[in-house]
Structures are given as structure tokens and as C-alpha cells.
Amino acid sequence: MSRTSDGNTAELWVPTGSATVRVPGKVNLYLAVGDRRDDGYHELTTVFHAVSLVDEVTVRNADLLSLEVVGEGADRLPTDKRNLAWQAAELMAEHVGRAPDVSIFIDKSIPVAGGMAGGSADAAAVLVAMNSLWELNLPRRDLRMLAARLGSDVPFALHGGTALGTGRGEELATVLSRNTFHWVLAFARSGLSTPAVFTELDRLRDVGSPPRLAEPGPVLAALAAGDPEQLAPLLGNEMQAAAVSLDPALRRALRAGVEAGALAGIVSGSGPTCAFLCRTAESALDVSAQLSGAGVCRTVRIATGPVPGARVVPTPGIAE
């Protein structure tokens, strides 16, 4: 557990209210990556899918901006201006002309550097929490604008559900997704840097591989049908080859999940978390148990999707 501030850490929370937000991680069901642009970014076409693995973020009024993180991967995260949640607090305060005098407490379940946009989720949660705590009543379009300034995945953490993302991923269109899909998430033993995975993808393409995905239309149709067996063979991620190149153990994990009974497995985003689509909740339990004993990953979690984006918890608990 760690706590820091931008100068002198406040010893006590200022007891003038709090807001707690739950925010989901995401799986990319489809991710096509364009060639690198002149500005260094890549054009993306992706289908985001929010899943029930959530971080809980509590924001309180305080004397100074501070950040504390506990839970999954907390010891690997900065608790200062390098953290996107801290930047979100500063951006929101700047937007409304106030000092960013809040304490942020993050209880993490989304893996760090896992390809599930955990840092982006926490930033989105801070925006929503401060909007509630300070009774700003900013419209969703303003929150989306601030989210897009923070990063490509932050707008989807606000949006939730299932969405088609274009541009750098920040331009979203809601996708109809019937029924509940069941997932097993396998966390790798170490993280992958998103820039490193993009660099490796560029290198692989320079030598002629990997192949490009077809258009996402069939994926959208399978989601609208609510059929996991129709969706499974359509899951695709052009970054997967690069992630596996950097972490070859992912190949074993992907194979083990399918051998355990999953319909299909995919590296989520830039990795290294592997997401396995299962027919039913019971099948997900079986796959989870077998993966846990296979020695191919650090931790296994069961999740469902789609779920809503960042939302205020009606009766927040007290983070100490």
C-alpha cells in the first residue's frame, strides 16, 4: 500500500464527502491496426467489450492531491503525476477552474500492463467521481472530451458495453450485443509495454507478416445474434502476433485454454492477458479450473460481458 502527494502528504482525509466509482476492464474482440502515421500513432478499428472485472475508485475532498493504490499490481504503479488517474484529477480541476485538492484511492482488480486498459479505466473513474463529488453535473459529452485528451482507451471506459472504436480507438459507436458472454481471463506473469508491442508489430510487418484481418461486419453480426459459437471463430487481434513474439509463453496459454474447452482464445489488446470465450457459465468454471492447474499463467479470473462503463456506486464504502 502506498500514499503520496505533490508535496506534503495529508495525514488525514478531509471529511467533506466522497464518491466511489466502479469501472470495468475491456477485451478487444476485434483489433485491426493500420500503418504507423506521421504523428507516430496507428489508425485502429476495434470492437471493445467491457467485462465484469472492475476497479473501484474512491475520490474524497482533501487538502492536497494524493493517490493510494491497493490490490492487483499496486506495487508496480506510480502514485504521482505519472499515473493517468492523477492526470485525470488535474485535467478535471483545470476544466472547471478549481485546485485538484482530492485524495484518490484505487482498489485494483484489472491487471497492470495487461491489455485490459486498467489505467485508462481508473482515469475515467476519477472523471466520473469528481463530477459527482463536486456536483458539477457536466454532461457526458464533456466527460468524453476530457477522456479523449487523456488517452485512446479512456472514452470506452466511460462508455462501457460493446462499441466499435475507430481513429486511435477514441471515436466510438455503440454496438448491439445480445445476451451475456462468458469469459475466462488468464493473467500473464509479467506485463507488456503497449509501445513495445506496436514497435514489434511494425517490425513483423516490415518482414512480411502477419496477415491483416477482414472487416469487422461478421463480428458485429455475431454479437447482435448473441451467439458465442458464431462469435468464437471471428475473434481477431492483429497485435497478437507481436505480443506472442515478445512473450512466447502466451502461445502455450492460448493453446491450453482451448484444450480446456474454451470456444476460442485471444490476446486482449496489446497483451499479455489472454481472454477465452466459453459457451456457458459452467463451461467457464471448468476452463478456469483447468487453466489454474496448467501452470501457463499467473492468475485466472472469470468474467462476463458486456457490462456498463464507469458508474457511481450508490452507497460507497469507506476506504481507509
From Swiss-Prot:
Alphabetized Gene3D superfamilies for the sequence: 3.30.230.10, GHMP kinase, C-terminal domain (3.30.70.890)
GO BP term, example: terpenoid biosynthetic process
Enzyme class: transferase
Residues of the active site: 26, 153
InterPro entries associated with the record: GHMP_kinase_C_dom, GHMP_kinase_C_sf, GHMP_kinase_N_dom, IspE, Ribosomal_Su5_D2-typ_SF, Ribsml_uS5_D2-typ_fold_subgr
Substrates-to-products reaction catalysed: 4-CDP-2-C-methyl-D-erythritol + ATP = 4-CDP-2-C-methyl-D-erythritol 2-phosphate + ADP + H(+)
NCBIfam families: ispE, PRK03188.1
Protein name: 4-diphosphocytidyl-2-C-methyl-D-erythritol kinase
